[in-house]
């Protein structure tokens, strides 16, 4: 009983309309903390239901791997979908709002585009690992990450509800009007139609990825073709309206 009380006190959830702030005990062993997080979210399951939220962490330094373990534990034991990680701060709720609205806008845009074609959109849930290739005769949505060495080829748009760290080719039949959306945009190579953009670390790219601004932290971004270049930009309603 004492252990259960301590575990319940080791995790505090503060929520707003767009996300959750997870306040964690600084000293509890990480394995026990994971269990406490799971119990806390199970107890709150009726409140969150099928929510799609941003998340932030406070009270304890977490490595990237530990953050991902916590997110995986939440998603595996609830119907919550974590869209992105937001650093804590005074503008936290505003950033969460921006990310969640960007997600909703991108999904809506994808649905509108799919409604105009006869070939159904393809969905894939899970992480694409090195060597895996997905091809689609229409648009494709990945609910997970695309790791280095993985590749997606689609005749339509590509939406990645996770991190893009591999290769993607949208509009593979030559359509430059297609786009690539990712919650965390770190591609090795993006191709839209006949245009190719590689990471600046890659030697002698045909077209460098041009960023109008460098994000201060992970945020949803979209890659579009314009004037013979591929641009990666923070996603906004104006951007979505232009594609």
Curated annotation (Swiss-Prot):
Pfam families listed in its UniProt record: MinC_C, MinC_N_1
Keywords from the UniProt entry: Cell cycle, Cell division, Septation
One GO biological process term: cell morphogenesis
Domain of life: Bacteria
The UniProt record lists the keyword tRNA processing: no
InterPro entries tied to this protein: CAP/MinC_C, MinC, MinC_C_sf, MinC_N_1, Septum_form_inhib_MinC_C
Gene3D superfamilies according to UniProt: 2.160.20.70, 3.30.160.540
Keyword Cell cycle: yes
Function field: Cell division inhibitor that blocks the formation of polar Z ring septums. Rapidly oscillates between the poles of the cell to destabilize FtsZ filaments that have formed before they mature into polar Z rings. Prevents FtsZ polymerization.
Subunit structure: Interacts with MinD and FtsZ.
HAMAP family found in the cross-reference section: MinC (MF_00267)
Family statement drawn from the similarity comment of this UniProt entry: Belongs to the MinC family.
Protein name: Probable septum site-determining protein MinC
Species lineage: Bacteria, Bacillati, Bacillota, Clostridia, Lachnospirales
Gene name of the encoded protein: minC
């Amino acid at each position: 009983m004492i252990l259960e009380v301590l575990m319940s006190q080791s995790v505090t959830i503060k929520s707003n309309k767009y996300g959750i702030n997870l306040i964690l005990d600084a000293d509890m062993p990480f394995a026990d903390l994971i269990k406490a997080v799971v119990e806390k979210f199970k107890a709150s399951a009726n409140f969150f239901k099928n929510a799609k939220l941003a998340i932030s962490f406070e009270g304890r330094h977490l490595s990237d791997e530990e953050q991902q373990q916590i997110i995986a534990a939440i998603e595996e034991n609830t119907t919550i979908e974590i869209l992105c990680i937001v650093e804590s701060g005074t503008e936290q709720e505003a950033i969460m709002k921006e990310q969640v609205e960007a997600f909703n806008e991108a999904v809506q845009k994808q649905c509108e585009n799919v409604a105009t074609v006869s070939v159904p959109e393809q969905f894939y849930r899970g992480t694409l690992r090195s060597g895996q290739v997905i091809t689609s005769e229409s648009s494709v949505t990945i609910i997970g990450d695309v790791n280095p060495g993985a590749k997606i080829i689609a005749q339509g748009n590509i939406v990645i509800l996770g991190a893009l760290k591999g290769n993607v080719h949208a509009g593979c039949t030559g359509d430059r009007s297609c786009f690539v959306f990712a919650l965390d945009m770190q591609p090795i190579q993006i191709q839209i139609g006949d245009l190719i953009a590689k990471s600046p670390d890659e030697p002698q790219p045909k077209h460098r990825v041009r960023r109008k601004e460098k994000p201060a932290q992970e945020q949803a971004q979209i890659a579009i073709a314009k004037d013979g270049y591929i641009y990666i930009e923070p996603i906004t309603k104006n951007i979505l309206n232009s594609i």
